[in-house]
């Protein structure tokens, strides 16, 4: 049996947007609350998701979820609700996360996100939805992150 400490990644995703709405605070404040919680719990890394709705889904893609729980009728509208951060915001979260002694990463869902995250993330995490997207995986792999 290996005697090593597990590396614990706190998956922030885009969940903080709902928390921000519920608490009437900015998404950036909510994301920092999540980072604080992860740090206090002893996590090693805070992981986010970076995308723009325009780059990952058609504006006409219908909802595939239970509309009684999430009334948003298109995938585009749902993703648009959670894509408000820009490079400056992610940089602020990166610095905040590092100041807490944790690694920072964000799953890029498009080439532009992969590019602007390059000097921020400690490593890339590929989304399961992109596992068959070999050109995108190769593009990220060429960046040489370990």
Model regions and ranges:
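Hydrophobic faces of well-ordered beta-strands that scaffold small-molecule active sites
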Residues: 8-12, 46-48, 104-107, 124-126
């Amino acid at each position: 049996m290996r005697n090593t400490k597990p590396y614990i990644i706190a998956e922030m995703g885009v969940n903080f947007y709902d928390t921000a709405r519920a608490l009437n605070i900015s998404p950036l404040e909510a994301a920092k609350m999540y980072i604080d919680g992860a740090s206090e719990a002893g996590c090693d890394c805070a992981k986010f998701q970076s995308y723009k709705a325009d780059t990952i889904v058609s504006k006409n893609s219908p909802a595939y979820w239970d509309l009684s729980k999430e009334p948003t009728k298109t995938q585009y509208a749902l993703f648009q609700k959670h894509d408000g951060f820009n490079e400056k915001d992610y940089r602020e979260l990166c610095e905040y996360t590092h100041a807490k002694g944790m690694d920072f990463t964000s799953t890029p869902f498009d080439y532009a996100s992969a590019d602007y995250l390059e000097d921020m993330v400690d490593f890339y995490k590929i989304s399961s939805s992109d596992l068959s997207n070999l050109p995108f995986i190769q593009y990220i792999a060429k960046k040489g992150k370990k």
